[in-house]
């Protein structure tokens, strides 16, 4: 694994006026989310966790959970991973539907969103466009100085997406 990129706090103006950046990692059964902000010492975690999707496929319940989270956090930008191709079309469609809910919640809350290609995310966060899940986890731990372990990779991926988004504002 290559050494993770060290963000320059001098280049980041986000710590002068606190801005939150949010990432969503959408899966077929759960949604990982991560929210970061910057201060003088670098990026910090504000909130991270999981939304378990409704088993009865109630889009309204899922939407309300997502909308409430976005309204509470008030992010400057929400970042999603772009769906580029999937061998399992059913899973890809399920993920796309939830991403649509997230985009709608962003539009409704007047929050900008960005979709990023997985290779671009991996390159920016770990320095390697072909990084695996473990490399991303290690890079996120390093960049955010995380002391605890999260239960799933979805949370690490969501935090990586939030970090990615914070570099573009």
Name each region found by the language model.
Residues 1-169:
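Phosphate- and other anionic-substrate recognition elements at nucleic-acid/protein interfaces
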């Amino acid at each position: 694994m290559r050494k993770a990129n060290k963000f320059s706090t001098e280049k980041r103006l986000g710590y002068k006026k606190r801005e939150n950046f949010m990432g969503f990692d959408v899966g077929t059964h759960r949604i990982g989310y991560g929210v970061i902000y910057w201060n003088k010492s670098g990026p910090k975690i504000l909130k991270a966790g999981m939304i378990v999707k409704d088993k009865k496929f109630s889009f309204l319940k899922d939407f309300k959970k997502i909308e409430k989270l976005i309204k509470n956090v008030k992010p400057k930008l929400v970042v999603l991973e772009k769906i580029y191709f999937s061998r399992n079309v059913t899973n890809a469609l399920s993920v796309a539907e939830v991403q649509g809910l997230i985009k709608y919640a962003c539009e409704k809350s007047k929050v900008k969103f960005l979709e990023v290609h997985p290779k671009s995310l991996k390159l920016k966060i770990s320095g390697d466009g072909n990084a695996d899940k473990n490399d991303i986890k290690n890079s996120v731990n390093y960049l955010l100085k995380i002391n605890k372990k999260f239960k799933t990779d979805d949370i690490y991926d969501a935090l990586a997406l939030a970090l990615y988004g914070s570099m573009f504002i």
